[in-house]
Amino acid sequence: MVPAKIIRRSIPSAILSVGRPLGKRGRARYNLRVFTLHPQLQTDCHPLGKLTGGRLLLHRNTAVTWFILVPETKAADLLDLPEAQLNSIMADGRALSVFLKNERNFPKVNFGAIGNLVPQLHLHIVGRTPEDACWPQPVWGNLPEGPAYTEPEIETLRNQLIEHCDLQPVD
């Protein structure tokens, strides 16, 4: 059996199940960084979990079903991502689109990466219907104040995403 101390030197604590987390110097040694969500996204959204391509958030306003997918990257623009990461996040976007259409009955899904107000790369995946609060206008800048999701509504949506999109909890 290999002692934990030896394993600890060769494997970052982010993937170890035992031992203390790596400090700042340890993360730098392994080129690891702590994921930090932009404050505006923290204010506007409920965290749901993690997909292969990044963190999944839910916009607080129930007027439309609006997901925000945030890749764990320093890149500012979608097309600046390495090909593998771009493919991963696009696959997540497609899975969310299929979920919105098939499980939530939205006839249209808007997909966008704008980033003018929030510089952290994030993608908007929004379920749309002619009956929604902004139709046919885009949701950006046109969304009226609306009620926030309740905890039971968030948990129901989270469970559906676990089943249909392989949503994972965030560590």
Label each residue range with its predicted role.
Residues M1-R8, Q42:
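Intrinsic structural disorder
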Residues V2-A4, A14, V18:
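Short amphipathic, helix-prone segments within low-complexity/disordered or flexible regions
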Residues I11, L16, V126-R128:
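Alpha-helical and His/Cys-centered functional microenvironments
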Residues S17, P21-K24, P47, T52:
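Intrinsically disordered, low-complexity segments enriched in small/polar residues
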Residues Y30-D171:
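HIT superfamily nucleotide-processing domains
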